[in-house]
Every structure is written in structure tokens, then in C-alpha cells.
Regions:
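PLP-dependent amino-acid enzyme catalytic core
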Residues: 1-491
Length: 491
């Protein structure tokens, strides 16, 4: 299978080249020139596969590695998860399920891809005879940074730099990154928000002077953000996996449609679900759940994407985003794979901060949007715990709220999988506050209190943080990112 760019239809490269490059030279994102299609018989057979074997099957249909290679990568990656089934599906009531994506080493859904990406990237570099070290440049709104750091820690032939908004992540997220171990890692806070960090990363990828300067240090750039196809493609797997779990439980029959409600910021997670539907998975609706930074919710309601609005720091910081990079891939797909259409919209976004697409393109895609404010989110955490004895994190609570609103508006009783993207222990003060109605500003105290009232085991990745030494506390201006990157690993 070959890949092209969302902005230049003449681009033709392999999957391994797309993974090494990260982003196309024209600024576009790599997309497959075609997608594998699975029949209902295929999908029924998938239910009997382990997570590793299902991932091997699906990734083999996208990437230019052998099945044995991919199987080895998957076994190594997913052996780091604390549950054998990697992404458990919990039944909540007659029509609601929780897909738990937070059982990896950093307790966030990003682990599903970022435990695997180092294997894919190093193999891709070798396959394409890359002599330089690969410098992975990452912008994070909280979870990607730690997952990428942990994934690439001391991986031979790689170095990694993570940029996070200094005042835009939770205390646990920040501490996870600032205490990161490894000789090939660097972490910088920036004075700005996630969009500023992401803009800096994208600009560096297109800056010939920066690329040349890094080449003098024997580095070639790549990315671990979901702009990299190697980050996005593993996420398709858990949509098929969760459908198989509902089949195995006997709660649906093959061919029955289900919904997914997905907390959305950069649009990567829900885009993987959209691609799964495109590949044959029986999906009725994808519910795109936003917090008060509701740029995506508004887009799916009106067809207008407008980042010209106030930016809010919320208790669901991984969704505090106004420029959703993966939406570019969605535009490419719904426009009939038209790079001119994408270029027009991306130019409008860069110059005016907004663009509009025909609403019928959104209707055909089967995605609906909604949002939850802070009070809604806290109420969802409280009510869900009261009803089901299940502590939601602050992002999954947004997805639950938007799903409940969708059901109230439509009466749709289709079985729905809510995608749970993080452990509640990554946001302990807000989760504890929502459940107990008591304020606790100290994160470690909140963790202990949350454990006492919920009975949910404190993950080792959290409990060991209290004794870890802070290694990275540098904060740079958003206009000084280039110097930070150039000097991070200078000998």
C-alpha cells in the first residue's frame, strides 16, 4: 500500500517512509491511497483473535513490514500493559459500554500507539537506510508527551523532545514528564497553549534552515504526534476489538450497528473510528465530544471551523485545543480525496482562522458533535460514580455527558461504546472534588482519598511519582523553541 499527502496528490511513498518522515514536505499529512475493506465474515472472525493478533492483522494490511515483524512489534509493545486483553470493554448498563484504553505504562490511550511506534519507527528507519539518528519532536496537551517519552526512552538511534504548555496540563501530567528517565529525552514547558506548541513543531518540520542545522548534528526529524501515520493507524484496532467484544458477549449480532462516543481534541482518536467505519465496521454514529473549547462540536453542528474564539483552560486539559490537526485528513476524505479542497481550507485557516465546508459532507460522514462545560463534567463524574461505582476521568466524563445529551435529543438506543482515554488518577484533584464535593488541592493527598472512596487500585506509574526526582524544569518562550530544540542534545 502506498501513501499520499493531503495537500499534494502526486506524492507516493510507502508506509515505512510515511512513519519516518512524520509529515509531508508540503505541510500535508500522509494518508493511505486506499483502505482495506473487511466483510462481516471477516469482522465476525476478528472476535476470536487476541488483541495482539488482531493488531497484527490490521497493521499488516497497512504497512510494508512482514506479518512476523509486526507480530513481534505488537507482542513487545502490548506486553507492557497491565491487562492481558490490553483494552478491556466493561458493560455499564443495557446499552452503554466503557472501552478502557488506560492500562498502559502511562495510563492514557496514547500508550496503545506509543508503545508500538518506537518499534515501527526504528524498523522503518532501518528499512529506508536512514543513517542519522531520528529526532522525535512532540507537542503535547498532556498525555502524548509522557507516553512518547516512555515509549522512546533509551531506544537506540532515537532522541525525543517534548513541548508542553506550562500552565495547560494537570499536575500529574506535568510531573510524569518532568521526572522522565532516559538518556535520550528532553522536556520543555512553553509559555503558551497546546496550539502554540503544535504550531512550533509543524513550523520546524517545514523550516529548511532548522532541518539543515539538525542534520549537522546528525539528526533527521520525525514526529510522535498523531500527525504521524504510525501513531494513528494502531488506534483503528481497538474499534474493531471492542465490536468483537460485544459480539462475544452476545449483546449484538454481526452486522448490528453500534455508536462510539469519543473525547476529542486533536481529532486523532475519533478519526481512527471514522477509518474503521470506512473499512467496514458497522458504526451508526461517531459522537465527537468536546469541552468548552468547542471548536469541533461547532464544526460538526454547522460545517464552520472557526478558531477565532477565546481559549479556556479546563479540567480536561488534553482537549484544550483550538486547532485540530487530524481534521485535515477528514477533509481530504470527505472531499473525495481532493488536495485542492484541503489546500484551500488550510490556507483559509492560516490566514483567516476559519473555513466552511458543505454540511452534507458532514452528514454523510455519520459524525455528530456536542460539548460539556465544567459543571456538566463534574456532575457526570459524580452521577456515574453514584450509579455504577465507577470513577471517570475528566475527559471520559465529557464523552459520557455528550452521549447522554445525544440520547436525550434523539432517543437512539443503539449500543454505545464510550472511549475512556485516561485513568482518573491522572486528574485526582478534580475527580475527587467531583465525587466527594470536597476540595483537595494536593494531588498526592487526592490520590489517596480517591483510592479510599473508590477502591480502585492506584497504578504503580502514579504511586512511584512521589519519590521521583524532577529532571526537567526549563520553560521557554514560544518564540524561542528553535533554540531549545537545537541545543537540547548538543555535545
Amino acid at each position: 500500500m502506498l501513501y499520499t499527502s493531503t495537500r499534494d496528490g502526486s506524492v507516493r511513498i510507502t508506509g515505512s517512509q510515511a512513519i519516518v518522515n512524520g509529515i509531508s514536505k508540503d505541510g500535508g499529512l500522509y494518508v493511505p491511497s486506499s483502505f482495506p475493506k473487511y466483510s462481516l465474515n471477516d469482522i465476525e472472525a476478528f472476535k476470536d483473535l487476541s488483541y495482539v493478533d488482531l493488531a497484527t492483522k490490521i497493521l499488516s494490511d497497512f504497512l510494508d513490514f512482514s506479518k512476523d515483524e509486526i507480530n513481534g512489534f505488537c507482542k513487545a509493545a502490548y506486553s507492557r500493559f497491565e491487562t492481558e486483553d490490553v483494552c478491556p470493554v466493561k458493560k455499564i448498563d443495557e446499552s452503554t459500554y466503557i472501552l478502557e484504553l488506560f492500562h498502559g505504562p502511562t495510563l492514557a490511550f496514547k500508550d496503545v500507539a506509543l508503545t508500538l511506534l518506537p518499534h515501527l519507527l526504528t524498523a522503518a528507519a532501518k528499512k529506508n537506510d536512514v543513517k542519522e539518528k531520528v529526532l522525535i519532536l512532540v507537542a503535547t496537551s498532556g498525555d502524548t508527551g509522557k507516553a512518547a517519552l516512555e515509549g522512546f526512552k533509551d531506544v537506540e538511534g532515537t532522541n525525543i523532545i517534548v513541548l508542553y504548555p506550562e500552565d495547560g496540563v494537570s499536575e500529574m501530567q506535568k510531573l510524569q514528564m518532568r521526572t522522565q528517565e532516559g538518556e535520550n529525552v528532553a522536556v520543555f514547558g512553553i509559555k503558551g497553549n497546546f496550539d502554540d506548541a503544535q504550531a512550533a513543531v509543524k513550523r520546524i518540520f517545514r523550516d529548511e534552515n532548522m532541518i539543515a542545522a539538525l542534520k549537522e548534528q546528525s539528526f533527521v526529524l520525525s514526529s510522535a504526534n498523531s500527525i504521524n501515520w504510525g501513531r494513528l493507524v494502531p488506534q483503528i484496532v481497538y474499534y474493531f476489538y471492542s465490536y468483537g467484544k460485544l459480539l462475544t458477549k452476545g449483546d449484538i449480532n454481526v452486522g448490528d450497528e453500534i455508536n462510539f462516543s469519543v473525547p476529542s481534541g486533536n481529532f486523532g482518536d475519533i478519526l481512527a473510528g471514522y477509518y474503521a467505519k470506512k473499512m467496514g465496521l458497522p458504526v451508526k454514529k461517531l459522537i465527537c465530544a468536546s469541552n468548552v473549547n468547542r471548536v469541533l462540536a461547532d464544526f460538526f453542528e454547522t460545517g464552520v471551523y472557526d478558531r477565532n474564539r477565546d481559549f479556556f483552560k479546563t479540567i480536561s486539559p488534553s482537549m484544550d485545543i483550538l486547532i485540530s490537526s487530524n481534521l485535515e485528513r477528514f477533509l481530504y476524505d470527505v472531499s473525495g480525496e481532493n488536495p485542492d479542497f484541503v489546500n484551500e481550507k488550510m490556507t483559509a485557516l492560516a490566514t483567516c482562522g476559519k473555513y466552511e465546508i458543505p454540511y452534507d459532507l458532514i452528514e454523510k460522514a455519520g459524525i455528530v458533535g456536542g460539548y460539556a462545560d465544567e459543571d456538566d463534567t463534574k456532575m457526570a463524574i459524580d452521577c456515574f460514580f453514584d450509579s455504577f461505582d465507577y470513577p471517570l476521568d475528566t475527559h471520559t466524563a465529557v464523552a459520557v455527558t455528550v452521549y447522554n445529551n445525544y440520547v436525550a435529543e434523539t432517543g437512539d438506543e443503539t449500543p454505545t461504546v464510550v472511549v475512556a482515554t485516561a485513568s482518573p488518577y491522572k486528574f485526582p484533584t478534580d475527580v475527587y472534588d467531583a465525587i466527594s464535593h470536597e476540595n483537595c488541592d494536593d494531588a498526592f493527598s487526592a490520590i489517596q482519598k480517591l483510592h479510599r472512596i473508590s477502591g480502585v487500585k492506584i497504578p504503580d506509574a502514579i504511586s512511584t511519582l512521589v519519590t521521583k526526582q524532577v529532571r526537567f524544569n526549563t520553560v521557554v518562550d514560544k518564540n524561542d523553541v528553535d533554540n531549545a530544540v537545537l541545543n537540547a542534545f548538543k555535545e
